């Protein structure tokens, strides 16, 4: 421990001697003093950049001094900057750039415009919307009329011989059939070889008997529209399949793909639309709904919400007819 204590003061003396050395002080002084720029060693490009930086510095100082001044009105002469008495005064070029907008234009007064003015009938340009068709009334529901009941559309098979015998024959309204005598004949003898026993006669229908209201029904059917005749034929096939036990398939709804032309677009559509665009095609569902004897026809887009709305409108119109 004593040896270490003896060595410490010696080290402190050596450090103080080095700090007091005049050579070290001279080197520090040379480092602190700035000798400046030697123009002989600089190129013309470097000297021009230095001058530009000085001009920029002067302009910035001038702008700061102008913003700090409270008085806005000053003399029209451009201010001069005096950096030092040895240098010449450099005039500052005032630029008409303001940080604040001083000249605000007045508001337009539309109340002074007369009716005969050319600005009265002006309106804005149409909006540039997409080229998809704009359907204002996508739901189309129409009442087709009443269809005759089912039991009035079928006629007896005697009057209409062209009809098939798929319907059950009314056995109650047939006239009495005369019974012919039947006599048994020998069948094993040579004299009666090839002779067969006569068959029982079938029921004899009187073709001259026609229902009284048949001609009235024919006149009534002749005055119908072809659309209602199509409905009656569908109902007739439905009842025939129901009697025969065949599976019934409903074909009232039809999916029709129709192309919406450019004329069906709204007035606000863009004028730059292409006529041959593939987006102008849309699927439309056409169908019929019959409530008892009332028939409604509808045309809607291929959308569930539109179909439900069509059903609601048909339901309300049908209830209004019953009132």
UniProtKB/Swiss-Prot annotation:
Compartment list: Nucleus
PTM entry text: Phosphorylated by FUS3 and KSS1, in a pheromone-stimulated manner.
Keyword Nucleus among UniProt keywords: yes
Modified residues (Phosphoserine): 34, 225, 266, 270
GO term, biological process aspect, one: negative regulation of mating-type specific transcription, DNA-templated
An example Gene Ontology molecular-function term: transcription corepressor activity
Induction: By pheromone.
Keywords for this protein: Nucleus, Phosphoprotein
This protein's name: Down-regulator of invasive growth 2
Function: DIG2 and DIG1 are negative regulators of the filamentation and pheromone induced mating program. DIG1 and DIG2 inhibit the transcriptional activity of STE12 by direct protein-protein interaction. DIG2 binds to the DNA binding domain (DBD) of STE12 and thus inhibits transcription when overexpressed.
Protein's gene: DIG2
GO cellular component term, pick one: nucleus
Note in the entry: Present with 1310 molecules/cell in log phase SD medium.
Source domain of life: Eukaryota
Lineage: Eukaryota, Fungi, Dikarya, Ascomycota, Saccharomycotina
Subunit composition and interactions: Forms a complex with DIG1, STE12 and either FUS3 or KSS1. The interaction of FUS3 with STE12 depends on the presence of both DIG1 and DIG2. STE12 is lost from FUS3/DIG1/DIG2 complex after pheromone treatment. DIG1 and DIG2 have also been reported to interact with CLN1 and CLN2.
Region annotation (Disordered) ranges: 1-26, 67-87
Biased composition (Polar residues): 11-26
Acidic residues bias spans: 1-10
């Amino acid at each position: 421990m004593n040896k270490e204590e003896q060595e410490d003061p010696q080290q402190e003396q050596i450090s103080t001697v080095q700090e007091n050395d005049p050579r070290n002080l001279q080197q520090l002084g040379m480092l602190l003093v700035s000798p400046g720029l030697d123009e002989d060693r600089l190129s013309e490009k470097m000297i021009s950049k230095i001058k530009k930086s000085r001009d920029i510095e002067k302009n910035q100082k001038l702008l700061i001094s102008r913003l700090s001044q409270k008085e806005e009105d000053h003399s029209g002469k451009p201010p001069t900057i005096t950096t030092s008495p040895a240098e010449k005064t450099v005039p500052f070029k005032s630029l008409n750039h303001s940080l604040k907008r001083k000249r605000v234009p007045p508001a337009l007064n539309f109340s002074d415009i007369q009716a005969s003015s050319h600005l009265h009938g002006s309106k804005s340009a149409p909006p540039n919307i997409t080229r998809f068709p704009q359907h204002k009334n996508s739901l189309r529901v129409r009442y087709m009329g009443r269809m005759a009941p089912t039991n009035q559309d079928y006629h007896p098979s005697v009057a209409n011989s062209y009809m098939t015998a798929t319907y059950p024959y009314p056995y109650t309204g047939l006239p009495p059939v005369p019974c012919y005598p039947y006599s048994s004949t020998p069948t094993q003898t040579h004299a009666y070889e090839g002779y067969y026993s006569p068959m029982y006669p079938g029921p004899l229908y009187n073709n001259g008997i026609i229902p009284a209201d048949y001609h009235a029904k024919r006149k009534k059917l002749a005055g119908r529209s072809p659309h209602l005749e199509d409905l009656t034929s569908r109902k007739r096939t439905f009842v025939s399949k129901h009697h025969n036990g065949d599976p019934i398939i409903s074909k009232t709804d039809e999916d029709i793909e129709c192309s919406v032309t450019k004329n069906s677009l709204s007035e606000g559509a863009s004028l730059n639309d292409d006529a041959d665009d593939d987006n102008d095609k849309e699927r439309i569902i056409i169908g019929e709904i019959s409530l008892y004897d009332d028939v409604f026809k509808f045309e809607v887009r291929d959308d569930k919400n539109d179909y439900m709305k069509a059903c609601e409108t048909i339901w309300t119109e049908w209830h209004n007819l019953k009132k």
